[in-house]
From Swiss-Prot:
It comes from Staphylococcus carnosus (strain TM300). Belongs to the RecF family. InterPro entries: DNA-binding_RecF, DNA-binding_RecF_CS, P-loop_NTPase, RecF/RecN/SMC_N, RecF_2. Its main location: cytoplasm. The keyword DNA-binding applies. The gene is recF. The keyword Transferase does not apply. The RecF protein is involved in DNA metabolism; it is required for DNA replication and normal SOS inducibility. RecF binds preferentially to single-stranded, linear DNA. It also seems to bind ATP. SUPFAM superfamilies: P-loop containing nucleoside triphosphate hydrolases. Coiled coil: none annotated. GO terms for cellular component: cytoplasm. This is DNA replication and repair protein RecF.
Amino acid sequence: MKLNALQLENYRNYEEVVLDCHPDVNILIGENAQGKTNLLESIYTLALAKSHRTSNDKELIRFNAEYAKIEGELSYRHGKMPLTMFITKKGKKVKVNHLEQHRLTQYVGHLNVVLFAPEDLNIVKGSPQVRRRFIDMELGQISAVYLNDLSQYQRILKQKNNYLKQLQMKQKTDRTMLEVLNQQFAEYALKITLKRVHFINELETLAKPIHSSITDERETLDLEYRPSLKLSEETDEAKLYEEVQKLLQDNMEREIERGVALYGPHRDDLGFKVNEMDAQTYGSQGQQRTTALSIKLAEIELINIEVGEYPILLLDDVLSELDDSRQTHLLSTIQDKVQTFVTTTSVEGIDHEIMKHAKLYRINQGEIIK
C-alpha cells in the first residue's frame, strides 16, 4: 500500500498543508520543533486512530482551533481509497471511502504502518508496559478480531478492578458479581493470550534470520512470550478456559486483599534472548538496538504476509541513532518495496543508493517548503 497524498487541517502546528507523497522514500528535513514528527504522527494517527505520543486527542488540535482533520488517499493493488479523520474536543469521527465508521475496529487496518522512533530502541530494556503496547498496536492492525477482544477485555478488567477495590474496602461483601466477572474475564484473557503467543511465534520466525544477517551470523535471537496465566501444553481451548477459571478462583482471596486483578494479559511480558542470554539484563546497547531493528523489519514482513500489502514505514529521527551497518541493512531491506517517511535534521551521514531517488521536503514552522 502507498499513501499518495496527505492533507492536514489544524493538526498540531499545521494550519493547512497538502503533501504529495513519493511512492518510495520521502525525507522531511528541518530543525527541531518545526513539525517533522507531527507530520509522521498524523500518518500514524490516521492509521491507528490514536497517537503514539499522547492519549489526549485534544492535544492534536491546533491552538485556538475547533477541530483537526487528517485525510489520506491510499492506493492498493486493487485500487484507491480515501481515509478521513475528524478530531474535535468531544471525540473523533472516521471515514473509509467517504463512509463513516461507527466502530474503530471497523476502521483500523485499512492503513498499516510500522513506526521506528528512538524510543522504540527501548523495547528491549523498557518496561513490560512498553512491550505490551507494542504487541497490541501491531497485532491490532492485522486482526480486527483481536482489537475487539482487547476492547472487551479492557472493559471487563476495569469493572473487575472496581469491584475488587470495593470488596477490599468492605464496601461490598457479595462475591457473586466477582465470580460472574471472572467468567467473562477468563474468556477474553485466554483469547488474547493465545493470539499474542501465536503472533510472537510468527514474529520470531521472521526476526531470527534478519538478526542473524545483521550480525553476520554472530548472534542468535529468540523471543519468549511470558504470560501471567501459567497454562499447560493443552491445546483444547475449553480445557485451557477451565485452567484459567481455576487459577482465578484459587487466587480470589489474594486479589481481593490487593484490590486489583493480578493475573491476565495486562500483566504479561515479552522477553528477548541474544545468544541464549537475556538481552534486557545482559545485552549490550548494540545488541539491544540490533534486536529492536530486527523486530521492526520482521513486523514489515509479517504485515505483508497477513495483509498481502507492505505497510508504510515511518522513521522518526532514528537513522542518526543507528551505526552505518545497521543503517545500511535497514535501507537495503526496504528499498523498492516499502514506502517510507523519514524525519531528520540533515541528510549528511545517510549514505545509501536509496537517497538518490528520495523526495525531499523542508519543514519550517508548520509549513512545507519543497
